[in-house]
Structure formats: C-alpha cells, structure tokens
Swiss-Prot record:
Disulfide bonds: none
Lineage start: Archaea, Methanobacteriati, Methanobacteriota, Stenosarchaea group, Methanomicrobia
Binding residue positions for L-phenylalanine: 335, 374-376, 414, 439
Record localization: Cytoplasm
One example GO MF annotation: tRNA binding
Organism field: Methanosarcina acetivorans (strain ATCC 35395 / DSM 2834 / JCM 12185 / C2A)
NCBIfam families xrefs: pheS (TIGR00468), PRK04172.1 (NF003210)
Catalytic reaction(s) noted: tRNA(Phe) + L-phenylalanine + ATP = L-phenylalanyl-tRNA(Phe) + AMP + diphosphate + H(+)
Protein name per UniProt: Phenylalanine--tRNA ligase alpha subunit
Pfam families: tRNA-synt_2d
Co-factor requirement: Mg(2+)
Keywords tagged on the record: Aminoacyl-tRNA synthetase, ATP-binding, Cytoplasm, Ligase, Magnesium, Metal-binding, Nucleotide-binding, Protein biosynthesis
Length: 492
C-alpha cells in the first residue's frame, strides 16, 4: 500500500492546501480545503500522526475590564476621586459624608500606599504630590476592548495589581497553526489524486449498485484496534470464589458468623490465656459493649483455664476473669465462628469452612491491613489424624495451582501438634500461608467433643498476592481501574 493510499479524501485535501499555503490557521485551512473547520483540523491531526503535517498551539493571554474597572475609567480610581477633591486636610467623617463609605474605604489604603496622603488622628492630610500612576494609564489604554500586555504597553506587575483589585480579568485564547512537513511536501510533489472513496459498504449501496466502479478505501490490517475491556469479576473476589468451590467440591459445609464476637468465643473458648499479648489494646479492636456468657459452657471453660478441668492438664492457673471474657471485640480470626459451630454440632461427622473478614490493629503497609480475609476450616470425625490434615491442605493448594507444598512445625495456643503450610513460588522461594493443627483437648472437652478436630486458618490475601503477582496488599482493596481492566481472567 502506497503512502497516498493510506490517506483519506479529507487528508488529501488538507495536504494539498498546506502544500500551497505552507502553514495556515484553521480558518484559512477551512477556506482553502473546502472543508468545515472541524473536519479540516481532524484531518490535520491525522496527518500529524503520519508525519506529514505539524500542528502547533499557542496560548495568547488577553485582559479585559470588569464592570468595576469600566466604571473607574469614567470616574477615576477611588484614590484619584478623593485626592482630586481634597484641597486641604479633612476629617475622615467628612469624606464619608461626601463619598460613599466603600469609596473612602478603598481609597484610604491606596492613598497611603501611593504616598498621596496620610492619616493623622482621623484626619486625611494630602501630600501635595499625586502624579498619574501606571495603573491609571493602563486602565485608560483598554478603551473598552480586550488587549494583550503588548497592546496595553503595560508591565506584568501593574496588570497583576489590577487583577488583585478585580478591575481586570484574564482570558486565555488558544491559536493553532498547521504546517506541512518535508515528508508531506514530498508526497504532495508526487501528485495527489482526489477521488471519492467508499469507506463502508452499506446495504443501501449493495441494493442500488452504486458501489460499482467506485474506489474502496483500503484497510490497514497491521494496526492494532483499541482494546476492548469486558465486564469481569474483581480478581480478588474471583480467587475467593475459587477457594469456596474447592471446599464445596470436597464435601464441606460453608458457615458464617458475626464480625462482633465476645472475648469468650474469640479467645477463651480456644484456650488462649487471658494475659496473652494478642488480647492487648494494640492488637485487638475492643468495643465498649459486653455480652452474657453461655451458661452451659462458661464454668467448664473457666475450670479448664484455671486447673485443666477433668483431663490430664494443669490449665493456665490463676483466676479466670469472667468480666474480661464478656467484653466484645471485632473478631481477630474466624476461628471464633468454627468453635461456635462445633459447640452447636459436637457429634461427628463435621466438615465446615468459613471464608470471611477478620480485624486486627495493624499499621497499613504493603503487607498489612487492619482488615483481611481468612479461610478457616475444621474436620471432626472418628479416627481423623494429623496425616489427614496434611493431605487435605496439600490437596487444596494443589487445586489452587501450587505444585510444591511443604509443612513446617509451628505453635498455636489451641492446637497440638501445629504446622505452618508453605508453597514454593518461583523467584520467591518458600512462602508461609497460615497455620493448622489438631485442636487440643483443652479446647474440645468443654463442649463435649470427643473425636479429633483438624483445624486450619489460612491467609487469603497473601495467597491472592502470589496468584496475582502483586507486591502491595493494598491493591486488592483499591479501585485501580487500569489494573482491574488488565487483570487476567484465566491462564490457559
């Protein structure tokens, strides 16, 4: 395809006009090309993209008088009105009776600033020297028209002062000039043929046969079209849904619970000591309300904390504080939801999971936020073992696309044994994604649970960062439209 074939009929007309004019303003280009000014400028911009023309833009600043400024060209500035009438010292009260209070108020400051007069004990005393100022000369130079600094023969400081006094206003006028480039002149010299082209074959053209013998505008297939961004689910929401589906397919029941939990269910029921650092104000959102303790469980949990209850345990010792257990908090983990579910369903089998938000007092940075999602789950049945827990978690991570999974020993107050699952990520190595273990008898015994309970709490947002290739956790919660548009729906 020749360079000329790549031009529309309007572009050809504008290029021919520019070849003759060299450069032109939009109105001259309109006149020479025979096109409307909008069509001519659209063609000029297209020629600029192709390197055949250039469009330069100049911003011209003009100034015009405000209504107040126009009034002062007739009456004189307030300070001029006062000084011309002031033949001898006069009290300010007398001036206010002769002129409007507004005029006297404005004039007083300017008379002193310009050195035309001074005020002594409430009396205006003229200095006897009040030559015409540049501001007065500039106001007179407008003559009722908008003008540039050059046309006013004014310095920028004087005009800036008049702007502050709101006697003039500034207008910005944009002017464009279109010029032909060397490449444009060379193409025009080859001879440009003006021939109407059909850009789109319509049903009317087909029916009438008017397309016969006409030239069709060629299409360039090497130009990428504008990207089309379809509607799609937020990447983070899509990953959460993927996790849900995995556990539902594995036969689990999804459970939910309130974000406000008592300290009893959030901490004490999980055999977390009442002096544990996680319960401090700097780690937990404590609320100003309290609740009633569950009568059927509170005494058993108290006994377990104080002395180990009826099992082979010594508990934490000391006196269990019931008032502390009654205090409401924003749940720091969703384990409070699963332990309540187990208390309501103490007989096997139980397979339940929860994906929901938890809250902790965290400083916001690329890897921490005070709100985050957690994937919690439990399995309670006869003959369940620690090996079953490892196999279940490995299966989950494999289904999420991680080929290598390993487990490291861990410690949590309410599970024994405990592990931390890790996955291998190219470029990062092994990454820890949560905690898991078998609930201790100190947790299950007060609720009448006799069978082993496998439990885990996995970090959802950290897993999402790995899957989405993010280094900043905050992007998951921000409305970055560009990132959302370009995020992958799936990887084939």
């Amino acid at each position: 395809m020749s360079a000329q074939d790549n031009l529309t009929i309007n572009e050809k007309k504008v290029l021919l006009a520019l070849e003759e004019l060299g450069s032109a303003a939009p109105d001259k280009l309109e006149e020479k090309s025979g096109l409307q000014v909008d069509a001519a400028m659209q063609a000029a911009f297209m020629l600029q993209e192709k390197g055949l023309a250039s469009v330069s833009e100049k911003v011209l600043e003009r100034y015009s008088l405000t209504k107040e400024g126009e009034e002062y060209t007739k009456t004189g500035l307030p300070e001029r009105q006062i000084i011309d009438a002031l033949k001898a010292p006069a009290p300010l009260e007398e001036l206010r009776s002769r002129f409007s209070p507004k005029t006297v108020g404005i004039a007083t400051g300017w008379l002193i600033k310009k050195g035309w007069a001074k005020v002594e004990n409430g009396v205006m005393v003229p200095s006897g020297n009040a030559p015409a100022g540049r501001d007065e000369e500039v106001l007179a130079a407008f003559a009722g028209k908008a003008k540039t600094l050059e046309e006013l023969a004014a310095d920028e400081g004087t005009v800036k002062e008049l702007l502050k006094r709101k006697l003039v206003i500034k207008h910005e006028e944009k002017s464009r000039t279109v010029s032909v480039t060397g490449a444009g002149s060379a193409l025009a010299a080859e001879g440009i043929v003006l021939e109407e082209e059909i850009a789109q074959l319509t049903p009317e053209l087909l029916k009438s046969g008017a397309w016969k013998g006409k030239k069709f505008r060629p299409y360039r297939l090497d130009i990428a079209p504008n990207p089309l961004y379809g509607v799609k689910i937020h990447p983070y929401r899509r990953l959460i849904e993927q996790m849900r589906q995995i556990f539902l397919e594995m036969g689990f029941t999804e459970i939910k619970g309130g974000i406000i939990q008592s300290s009893f269910w959030n901490f004490d029921a999980l055999f977390q000591p009442q002096d544990h650092p996680a319960r401090d104000m700097q780690d937990t959102f404590h609320l100003g309300s309290i609740c009633q303790l569950p009568a059927e469980y509170s005494d058993k949990v108290a006994a377990m904390h104080e002395s180990g209850g009826d099992i082979d345990s010594c508990g934490w010792g000391g006196i269990w504080d019931r008032e502390l257990a009654r205090r409401n908090v924003l749940r720091t983990h969703t384990t409070s939801v699963t332990i309540k579910y187990l208390a309501d369903n103490p007989e096997p089998p139980v397979k339940a999971f929860c994906i929901d938000r938890a809250y902790r007092r965290e400083t916001i940075d690329p890897t921490h936020t005070p709100e985050f999602e957690q994937l919690e789950g439990v399995v309670m049945d006869k003959d369940m073992s620690f090996a079953d827990l490892l196999g279940l978690l490995a299966e989950f991570y494999h289904r999420m696309g991680f080929e290598e999974v390993r487990f490291r020993p861990g410690y949590f107050p309410y599970t024994e044994p405990s592990v931390e699952p890790e996955v291998y990520v190219d470029g990062l190595g092994w990454v820890e994604l949560g905690g898991a273990g078998v609930f201790r008898k100190e947790v299950t015994e007060p609720f009448g649970i006799k069978e082993p309970v496998l439990a885990w709490g996995l970090g959802v947002s950290r897993l999402a960062m790995l899957k989405l290739g993010l280094k900043d956790l905050r992007l998951l919660y921000q409305s970055d439209i560009d990132w959302l548009r370009k995020s992958e729906v799936c990887r084939i």
